[in-house]
UniProtKB/Swiss-Prot annotation:
Keyword Nucleotide-binding included in the entry's annotation: yes
Entry EC number(s): 2.7.11.32, 2.7.4.27
HAMAP family noted in UniProt: PDRP
InterPro entries named in the record: Kinase-pyrophosphorylase, PPDK_reg
The protein's name: Putative pyruvate, phosphate dikinase regulatory protein
Family: Belongs to the pyruvate, phosphate/water dikinase regulatory protein family. PDRP subfamily.
Domain of life per record: Bacteria
Job of this protein: Bifunctional serine/threonine kinase and phosphorylase involved in the regulation of the pyruvate, phosphate dikinase (PPDK) by catalyzing its phosphorylation/dephosphorylation.
Length: 273
C-alpha cells in the first residue's frame, strides 16, 4: 500500500538568480517519493535587511533552508538565524568551494553570481526577477500592463514559485490572489499587454497543502474553512467564474510540476503573440 504524500517547506536563499539552488534542492527532494517540497525561492538576497525579511517568511512556514550567499557576513547571519530557530540549514556551495580551495591552493574570489555571463540575457532575467518580486501576491496592482504574464488564483495554487520560475527565464510575471467575493483589480481587467492565466487545482490538493502549512505554523489562528473542501470548492468556482467571464485561460496545477506549469504558460504566450 502506497503511503500518502506529505509536504514540507523548502526555502532557497540566493544572492543571484537561484537556479543553482533550485537544481540542488530538486535533485535531493526527488529521492523522497512520498514527500513533496513546497518551494520558496528568494533570489537577489544581498543585504541584511533582505535576509531579515526572508526569515519573517520562514518563521511562518519553517522547513529546510538551502542557500548560496558568497558574502560571509550574510552567510553567518543566515546560519545564526537557523540555529536560533532550530532549523536545518546548508550552504550548498561551501563544501565545493572548500575542495577547490584545497586542491588549487587559493581561496575563492567570492564574486556574487560569478557563474553567470553578464550579457544582455542575464540582465533581462535580473530585471524580470526584480519586477516579479515587486509584484508578488497582489503588490503594486496598478502596474499590471508592465507585466508579460499575470497569474491569478486562490491561495496555494503555486502562483509565487511559478512566477519566479518564469522570471528566471526573463518573463516579467506578476501574481494576484483571488479571494472569494472580492473583485479582481480594475487595472488587471483593463490591462492589454500581459497574458493573464488562472491557476486552479483540485480541492483535495489545495486542502492537503494548506493543512501542511498549518502544521508548520501552529501559532497562528487559521479559519476552519481554510482547509474545508466544500469551502475550497466555492473559492475555485469563484476563480473559474472570473476567468470565464474575462476569457482568461486556466491551467490545472494539481498534477503538474512548476516546470510543467511554466511550460504550458510559455506555450500559451506563443499562441497569443
Amino acid at each position: 500500500m502506497n503511503k500518502p504524500q506529505s509536504f514540507f517547506h523548502l526555502h532557497l536563499i540566493s544572492d543571484a538568480t537561484g537556479e543553482t539552488l533550485l537544481a540542488a534542492g530538486r535533485a535531493a527532494s526527488a529521492q523522497y517519493k512520498d514527500a513533496r517540497a513546497i518551494e520558496h525561492i528568494y533570489p537577489l538576497i544581498r543585504t541584511e535587511k533582505q535576509v531579515a525579511k526572508v526569515f519573517e517568511d520562514i518563521e511562518e512556514e519553517p522547513g529546510i533552508i538551502l542557500y548560496t550567499v558568497v558574502d560571509q557576513k550574510l552567510a553567518r547571519g543566515i546560519d545564526e538565524r537557523c540555529a536560533t530557530m532550530g532549523l536545518p540549514c546548508v550552504s550548498v556551495l561551501e563544501p565545493v568551494l572548500t575542495v577547490f580551495q584545497s586542491y588549487l591552493g587559493t581561496p575563492a574570489g567570492r564574486r556574487v553570481g560569478a557563474q553567470h555571463v553578464l550579457d544582455a540575457e542575464y540582465f533581462r532575467r535580473i530585471d524580470a526577477l526584480n519586477f516579479t518580486m515587486d509584484h508578488d501576491d497582489g503588490q503594486l496592482p496598478a502596474n499590471m500592463d508592465d507585466a508579460d504574464v499575470v497569474l491569478i488564483g486562490i491561495s496555494r495554487t503555486s502562483k509565487t514559485p511559478t512566477s519566479i520560475y518564469l522570471a528566471n527565464r526573463g518573463i516579467k510575471t506578476a501574481n494576484i490572489p483571488i479571494v472569494l467575493g472580492v473583485p479582481v483589480p480594475e487595472s488587471l481587467v483593463s490591462a492589454s499587454k500581459p497574458l493573464i492565466v488562472g491557476l486552479i487545482a483540485t480541492a483535495e490538493r489545495i486542502s492537503h497543502v494548506r493543512q501542511n502549512r498549518i502544521l508548520g505554523n501552529s501559532s497562528s489562528y487559521v479559519p476552519t474553512d481554510y482547509v474545508d473542501r466544500a469551502a475550497i470548492n466555492e473559492e475555485l468556482a469563484y476563480a473559474r467564474q472570473i476567468c470565464t467571464r474575462h476569457g482568461w485561460p486556466m491551467i490545472d496545477v494539481s498534477r503538474r510540476s512548476i516546470e510543467e506549469t511554466a511550460a504550458a504558460i510559455v506555450a500559451l504566450r506563443g499562441k497569443n503573440r
